[in-house]
Amino acid sequence: MNKIVFFLPAFYSPKCRNSSGGTISNYLMIRQLSNYYKINIVSPDVKVDPILNENISCITTNQYVGISLYNKLKKIKWYSDSIKNYFAKNKPDVAVYTNTTNLFFNRKKCKKNILLVRAYEDFFSIKMAGENKVESLVRRMKKTLLTKKIHKVYNEVDIIITNSNYMRDKIIKEFEITQPEKIKVVYPPIDISPSHPYKNISNIARRVTIGMINPSPAKGDFIFIGLAKKFPNVNFMYFSKNNKQYQLENIIYGGWISDRSSLFSKIDLLIVSSQWPEPFGRVSVEAIRSGLPVIVSGSGGLTETVDKLFVIEKYDCIDEWVNKVEWAFNNTDILENTWSKSLEVSEQFVTEQHEKSLLEIFHS
């Protein structure tokens, strides 16, 4: 059985409180590949209990978890030493790096090298969501010090796997890729079966509830608040690790719920009002496959996850969102038809399609 090594900044179970769209996608990818390959994971932060199966093993430390400069520097040193030691003792068939670990890439150490790009950490020209002044300074310093190195990595790896056509185009432009055919779009796997009935808002006897996940300025929380003010007879429920205390009677804190089925059962329509270009839109696909209509920003990879009628192009304009919500309330037949079309779109994100795409890459 061939061996694959993943060099990851973190390896989390989807139910871990620290999990994100990227860590969930990595977890599901590794779970699928472990049915065909031996998997080694080198990561300083592992929160998976139990380890998925006997084909997966981890090299970890868990000593340097935290955001302090000391921990970050120690983590970099740990990466460097651990990757060097790993290659001294092992000869994997495939090495997989990510945005965070690609600085340690050495094409001579493995016959096939793959780079996973699910986010913007290497895009030093792009301001990150929620970036503060210190983070902005660090990004600009990285741009000065690391741009040449990162461009070299992107052009030397054998394959780049990314999570949307939007990201593919951004990678080609940002890193001046000379062989764009090596960039493979593998949509993140969504392991929610479409067995949930459509939630028709015209049949709801109680007050309709519109939901949002992780509101923040980058996620467009001002849209959420503006809609709550415009529709006082509609409940607005948000889910996050922290209670934001919005001080509006019809805005309800739903807590943090890792189980998506339980979360989506509490709302009738989801908005994804991101004001920055999301690489993909996992939550919108999960909601569609859970029977919910979803309205999304025309931003980044979000537009690839739903039918075009669910997309708002002028996504920074509150009036556009108000009009779309009113459209949803007044055109329930069209709303359901648009949801059905979005459900068809979501079929390209199912676990089986993801596995097929992965095997085409890793078997070649």
Q: Can you say where each PLM-predicted feature lies in the sequence?
A:
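A charged, aromatic-enriched C-terminal amphipathic alpha-helix characteristic of glycosyltransferases
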Residues: 74, 316, 333-363
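Membrane-proximal helix-turn-helix segments that form the acceptor-binding/catalytic region
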Residues: 28, 84-85, 136-160
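Conserved acidic donor-binding segment of nucleotide-sugar-dependent glycosyltransferases
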Residues: 215, 309-319, 327-332
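Donor nucleotide-sugar binding/catalytic pocket of nucleotide-sugar-dependent glycosyltransferases
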Residues: 155-196
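Conserved catalytic-core segment of nucleotide-activated headgroup transferases in glycan assembly
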Residues: 192-194, 199-249, 253
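N-terminal subdomain of nucleotide-sugar transferases
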Residues: 1-47, 90
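Short hydrophobic beta-strand element within catalytic cores of glycosyltransferases
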Residues: 293-296
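Active-site proximal beta-strand in glycosyltransferases
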Residues: 5, 94, 107-140, 161
